[in-house]
Swiss-Prot record:
Native source organism of the sequence: Rickettsia bellii (strain RML369-C)
Annotated GO biological process: DNA topological change; DNA-templated DNA replication
UniProt key word DNA-binding: yes
Protein family: Belongs to the type II topoisomerase GyrA/ParC subunit family.
This protein's name: DNA gyrase subunit A
Length: 905
């Protein structure tokens, strides 16, 4: 065991040591591993692979070589790391779905879009791609500096003399210590055009560069959404670019469609994408898909998604975009090494760095070629003098004892150069002329003379020497012109860029869609008719309308809701999943919600408590729900009419309720013993019909009420009520232009005939026996509305709205229905159309749909007919209308035999 001498120990501060060591490690990772150089766009491992393949002669016009051999050369000479890291880098450079211009030409399995790994390196073969030669061209002309390799046995280039901006064309990605880079690939032609614009004008604005560089061009194609992310990335070096796969909608006939995905976003695993879609379907986050399969082959991507009948393909596609990587974002961080240090650069800075580097490369190459041309001209001048003085040259050589003596003698003599002075000046070789204006051979020239073949003494060879000298003089002049003129140098730079563009540029693969693409959540919601049911216990649910079946009047119905704890349904209406709704509570608060946010259930389900959906406080509960038009432009001319059980009404502007915070807002002030019965949108030219449970009704114009701006007002008296009576419904009707006499005359015509006239059948006004013109009869028939009244014992009737005369608000009303013990109290009054259907719900949860065309039209003062056959103790608690759907027609015949046509009139 060694005895440590205290004199050999140097105490250090551990914080300082960690700081220095960590920074050294961080810079090593940044400079030597993870971050590309802005000049050639390569990390050290990629640069070493290309240089090693070049040195080994593994060129594009040569045979493929085993990848294992290439990896071995790189690891042994330049990159002392694991072979898997080198091979992974080699594989990526060969993948046409990773690089816009692959730098390696691979043969064998080099992976796939499904995330399949490449075959082992012993099985695959590689060689340089043709475009890779443009990265390394002129490397043998002293264009870039070389550094010793890891053990000093070899030299490797610090950068490749790239002839095109590879950093932008192929992009790069990497994670270093404390920083990361993520540069997207671009179109070669666009990037070179931008470089040429910068060469022409170094002060060009970045936005002007964006005119030619439209945006990233990913090898997997796809669609870029909007330009804001592109502008941010190019202006600041950072940004987020939304990418979407390309999909087409194919009609299969019979109401069915299919979605065909032909392109996916960059770096998205196709197999994982298909799995994710399947997962979302299983979790019911994506609905409407009946079949999913991957039909991709060597010809391209094809993901086939077949939809169920009558499903809107655009909605399903939006759901796929939202829930999977078919739409993703590419976070741009244009970080690269500039002058050996990491820097986030904008588009102009990257292009400027590349152009500046190419200037250096072309300058170094020109200096190298100039020196080579001068060296060759120097030798040719010596040979020319020797040929002109061949006899003396031969004599000196013959007299010399050995080659060295001959060389020294040739160098010691001065030669007359009058006949070649123009050539000497032409090639600018001042080293040959002495003070006397004669020429002396240099050692290189003397050696070349001694090695000259006798055939050079012929007249033809003599002329060829002079011709070669003149050509070299032209080259030297051009090189000097390049070095002396930056304009000429930049001209060459542009010419070489354009040549690369002409040889390797391809059309843009990724398209760009302009506009804003902040996707509304409603774009993901399938438009579907829903039945919304609300219970006395505060439960709410939505059920697809297609879940219910049409029955005939008098049928027994089906179980629509499983009741617990004597909970009964208090409200039911039909709307679209996109229908906006206002929720009014017992304390006069209003909340806003879209229908699709309600819990989806089945006819037997109870739903969810509204207290779990809305931020209700304490004993607050929802008493009324008002569906609104989907198009908010229709709200401008609408008011809201409030009606309370005590007969109070209030007219407010609907726009006052357009913006409601999530915690709601005050809608109306209520007395303690009053409650909100109904809230409906209305227009100024319409009428309001208030109906009570005892069979009374009052009709008055909306315009007779002023708009009350105060949301805390309880309104004005709408109807005077008897002691035990209360308002149970409010109906909005069309305004009546006809006089009372005209209405009475019109109502004397049978309702069957009136319906025929409304349907467009011809009629003779004189045969009708009324004192009305044909035009008046036709106008009234087209404008006629019918009021449906339903009682708790299942009775109902339809009456013409013309039978309800207009009175002032505040009155006690007229008879709406003849109420008795058999009919029970009124539970619902509403306007109906001939093709409407009625949905009734009882306190036991039984539900039935009834076509209203089977309900007789009678006068106001009648008891109606049986709509619903009730069991003992059963009462109707809710009634709502359903617009006719195509599904009903298909089901009528199926259930016609099941349901007996019963009920008394």
């Amino acid at each position: 065991m060694t005895d440590n001498n205290s004199s050999n120990l140097v105490p250090v501060n551990i914080e300082d040591e960690m700081k220095v060591s960590y920074l050294d490690y961080a810079m090593s990772v940044i400079v030597s591993r993870a971050i590309p150089d802005v000049r050639d766009g390569l990390k050290p491992v990629h640069r070493r692979i290309i240089y090693s393949m070049h040195e080994a002669g593994n060129h594009a016009n040569r045979a493929y070589r085993k990848s294992a051999r290439i990896v071995g050369d790189v690891m042994g000479k330049y990159h002392p790391h694991g072979d898997s890291a080198i091979y992974d880098s080699l594989v990526r450079m060969a993948q046409d779905f990773s690089l816009r211009l692959p730098l390696v030409d691979g043969q064998g399995n080099f992976g796939s879009l499904d995330g399949d790994a490449a075959a082992a390196m012993r099985y695959t073969e590689s060689r340089m791609a043709k475009v890779a030669h443009k990265l390394i061209e002129d490397i043998d002309k002293e264009t870039v500096s070389f550094n010793p390799n890891y053990d000093g046995s070899e030299e490797e280039p610090s950068v490749l003399p790239s002839m095109f901006p590879n950093l932008l064309v192929n992009g790069s990605g990497g994670i270093a210590v404390g920083m990361a880079t993520n540069i997207p690939p671009h179109n070669l032609g666009e990037v070179i055009d931008a470089c040429c614009l910068y060469v022409d004008n170094n002060d060009i604005e970045i936005l002007d560069l964006l005119e030619v560089v439209k945006g990233p061009d990913f090898p997997t194609s796809g669609i870029i959404l909007g330009v804001n992310g592109i502008k941010s990335a190019y202006l600041t070096g950072r940004g987020s670019i939304a990418i979407r796969g390309r999909a087409e909608i194919e009609n299969l006939g019979n109401g069915r469609q299919a979605i065909i995905i032909t392109e996916i976003p960059y770096m998205v695993n196709k197999a994982r994408l298909v799995e994710k879609i399947a997962e979302m379907v299983k979790e019911k986050r994506i609905e409407g898909i009946s079949d999913l399969r991957d039909e991709s082959n060597k010809n391209g991507i094809r993901i086939y998604i077949e939809l169920k009948k009558d499903i809107v393909a655009e909605v399903v596609l939006n759901q796929i975009y939202s829930c999977t990587q078919l739409q993703t974002s590419f976070g741009v961080i244009m970080l690269a090494l500039k002058d050996g240090l990491p820097k986030v650069m904008n588009l102009k800075e990257v292009i400027a760095a590349f152009v500046s580097f190419r200037e250096v490369v072309i300058t170094n190459r020109t200096i190298y070629l100039l020196n080579k041309a001068r060296d060759k001209a120097h030798i040719l001048l010596g040979l020319t003098i020797a040929v002109s003085n061949i006899d003396e040259i031969i004599r000196i050589i013959k007299a010399a004892s050995d080659p060295n003596a001959a060389k020294q003698e040739l160098m010691a003599r001065s030669w007359d150069a009058l006949n070649i002075l123009p050539l000497v000046k032409l090639v600018d070789d001042k080293a040959m002329l002495n003070e006397e204006g004669k020429c002396s051979f240099t050692e290189a020239q003397a050696k070349a003379i001694l090695e000259m073949r006798l055939q050079r003494l012929t007249a033809m060879e003599k002329n060829k020497l002079e011709e070669d000298l003149k050509n070299l003089a032209t080259e030297i002049t051009e090189y000097l012109n390049i070095l002396g003129s930056r304009e000429r140098l930049l001209e060459i730079l542009k010419e070489e860029l354009i040549k690369v563009k002409e040889e390797f540029a391809t059309p843009r693969l990724t398209s760009i869609e302009f506009g804003e693409f902040d996707q509304d959540i409603e774009d993901l919601i399938q438009r579907e008719e829903m039945v919304v049911t609300v219970t006395l216990g505060g439960y709410i649910k939505r059920v697809p309308l297609s879940s219910y079946r049409a029955q005939k009047r008098g049928g027994k119905g089906r179980s629509g809701l499983s009741m617990r704890d004597e909970d009964i349904t208090t409200q039911v209406f039909v709307g679209s999943t996109h229908t906006p709704m206002l929720f009014f509570s017992n304390i006069g608060q209003v909340y806003s919600l879209k229908l699709y946010k309600l819990p989806l259930s089945n006819p037997q389900g109870k739903g969810r408590p509204m207290v779990n959906i809305l931020p209700l406080k304490g004993d607050e509960h929802i008493t009324n729900i008002m569906p609104l038009p989907e198009n908010q432009d229709e709200w401008d001319n609408l008011n809201i009419m409030f009606a309370t059980a005590k007969g109070n009404i209030r007219r407010s502007d609907l726009l006052d309720f357009k913006k409601i915070q999530s915690n709601g807002k005050i809608a109306i002030r209520l007395d303690e013993d009053d409650k909100l019965i109904d809230v409906k949108p209305c227009k100024e030219d319409e009428h309001i019909l208030l109906a009570t449970k005892s069979g009374k009704a009052l009709r008055f114009p909306v315009e007779s009420l002023r708009v009350i701006k105060s949301r805390t007002s309880d309104g004005v008296r709408g109807m005077r009520l008897a002691e035990d009576d209360s308002v149970i419904s409010m109906t909005v009707l069309k305004g009546i232009k006809a006089t009372r006499e005209e209405r009475d005359a019109y109502l004397s015509v049978s309702w069957e005939k009136r319906l025929e006239i409304a349907k467009g059948e011809e009629f003779n006004s004189e045969e009708l026996g009324v004192d009305l013109t044909a035009e008046s009869i036709l106008e009234m028939a087209n404008s006629e509305e019918f009021i449906l009244t339903v009682t708790e014992n299942g009775f109902g009737k339809r009456s013409s709205a013309y039978g309800y005369r207009i009175t002032d608000r505040g009155g006690s009303g007229i008879i709406n229905m003849d109420i008795n013990d058999k009919t029970g109290l009124v539970v619902g009054v509403m306007p109906v159309k001939m093709d409407d259907e009625l949905m009734l719900i009882t306190n036991s949860g039984k539900l039935i749909r009834c076509k209203l065309e089977t309900v007789r039209i009678t006068g106001r003062n009648t008891s109606g007919v049986t709509l619903f056959r009730l069991d003992d103790g059963e009462k109707v608690v809710s009634a709502s209308l359903i617009a006719e759907s195509s599904d009903d027609n298909e089901e009528d015949s199926e259930f016609e035999e099941e349901v007996a046509e019963e009920g008394s009139e």
